[in-house]
């Protein structure tokens, strides 16, 4: 009862804080100069991170197993991982714009996880026999860590494409669409150009030079982050194969989740392979990574919507009225 009450309090604190952060985020989209509000948003995200950490620890202690048994718990863990990825660049360099990319994903994931749509999964339950294994923490945590990392890397590639081609399509016009501002792509370009201008006041630099520098930097970031995510995904799939052999007597069953995990792995393998070809670096490889962003969400969330296959434990269902 104590742990259930604590989890309830931490969840409400997290949801309330993230709601305030979303409001601040929307305000700063309209008024870029409100530096104080942006700092308040970062403090709110830190408070939410500690609330999530407290929730995960409480759920782990009360249930006796690592909290990854259903979609609700995995979403909480995914948002917790995104918070870490959001924080690391700021610790290394307070002016690193990589954290700017992760902000919307972190906010939206946590907002959905703590909303009322997953109320039926809020209560901790006893694991089904197939999940009562030490492989649960190893396999699922590796998969979620890889998803979070690959999502960030894919967003960096998407930012590269949008910044490079935004003038070619009316859809990406800042005057007509708030899409760029919502995901901070224009903010990155603005901050980078401003910072470069301060460093190069002794001689004139053309705007296209800032654009070139920024896209090259995004390309480098994307490659590094996706390489890490691909490694984690490979380890996660291998752990899952070993666990499947112990539980079901077969390393691979072409279950829908397994099939889409293989598709995800293939997409990012193609991305990494394309990086070895100089002609495919930059725009072409970024396009592959951007496709991977959608594939990850299908693999992770889309399959849970269907609730089919061997990986249907804790699948998503709409609350009944």
Curated annotation (Swiss-Prot):
Transmembrane regions listed in the UniProt entry: 9-29, 44-64, 68-88, 143-163, 225-245, 259-273, 288-308
Membrane topology, as annotated: Multi-pass membrane protein
HAMAP family assigned to the protein according to its UniProt record, in alphabetical order: CytC_CcsA
Keywords (A to Z) from UniProt: Chloroplast, Cytochrome c-type biogenesis, Membrane, Plastid, Thylakoid, Transmembrane, Transmembrane helix
Keyword Transmembrane on entry: yes
Organism the protein comes from: Sorghum bicolor
One GO biological process term: cytochrome complex assembly
Known partners and oligomeric status: May interact with Ccs1.
InterPro entries: Cyt_c_assembly, Cyt_c_biogenesis_CcsA, Cyt_c_biogenesis_CcsA/CcmC
One Gene Ontology cellular component: chloroplast thylakoid membrane
Known role: Required during biogenesis of c-type cytochromes (cytochrome c6 and cytochrome f) at the step of heme attachment.
Family, as annotated: Belongs to the CcmF/CycK/Ccl1/NrfE/CcsA family.
Pfam family, one: Cytochrom_C_asm
UniProt-annotated location(s): Plastid, Chloroplast thylakoid membrane
GO molecular function: heme binding
Protein name: Cytochrome c biogenesis protein CcsA
């Amino acid at each position: 009862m104590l742990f259930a009450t604590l989890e309830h309090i931490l969840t409400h604190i997290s949801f309330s804080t993230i709601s305030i952060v979303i409001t601040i985020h929307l305000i700063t989209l309209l008024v870029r100069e409100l530096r104080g509000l942006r700092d308040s948003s970062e403090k709110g995200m830190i408070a939410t991170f500690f609330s999530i950490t407290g929730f995960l620890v409480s759920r782990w202690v009360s249930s006796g197993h690592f909290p990854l048994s259903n979609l609700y718990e995995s979403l909480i863990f995914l948002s917790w991982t995104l918070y870490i990825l959001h924080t690391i660049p700021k610790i290394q360099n307070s002016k690193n714009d990589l954290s700017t990319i992760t902000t919307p994903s972190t906010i939206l994931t946590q907002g959905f996880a703590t909303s009322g749509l997953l109320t039926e999964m809020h209560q901790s339950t006893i694991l089904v026999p197939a999940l009562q294994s030490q492989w649960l923490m190893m396999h699922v945590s590796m998969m979620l860590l890889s998803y979070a990392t690959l999502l960030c890397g894919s967003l960096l590639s998407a930012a590269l494409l949008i910044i490079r081609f935004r003038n070619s399509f009316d859809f990406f016009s800042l005057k007509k669409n708030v899409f760029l501002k919502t995901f901070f792509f224009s903010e990155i370009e603005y901050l980078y150009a401003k910072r470069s201008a301060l460093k190069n006041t002794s001689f004139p630099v053309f705007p296209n030079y800032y654009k070139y520098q920024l896209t090259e930097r995004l390309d480098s970031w994307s490659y590094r982050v996706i390489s890490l995510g691909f490694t984690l995904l490979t380890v996660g799939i291998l752990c899952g194969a070993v666990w499947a052999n112990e539980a079901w007597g077969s390393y691979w069953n072409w279950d829908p989740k397994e099939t889409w995990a293989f598709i995800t792995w293939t997409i990012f393998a193609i991305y990494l392979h394309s990086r070895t070809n100089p002609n495919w670096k930059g725009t072409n490889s970024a396009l592959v990574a951007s496709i991977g962003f959608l594939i990850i969400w299908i693999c992770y969330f889309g399959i849970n919507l269907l609730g089919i296959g061997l990986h249907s434990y804790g699948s998503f269902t709409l609350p009944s009225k």
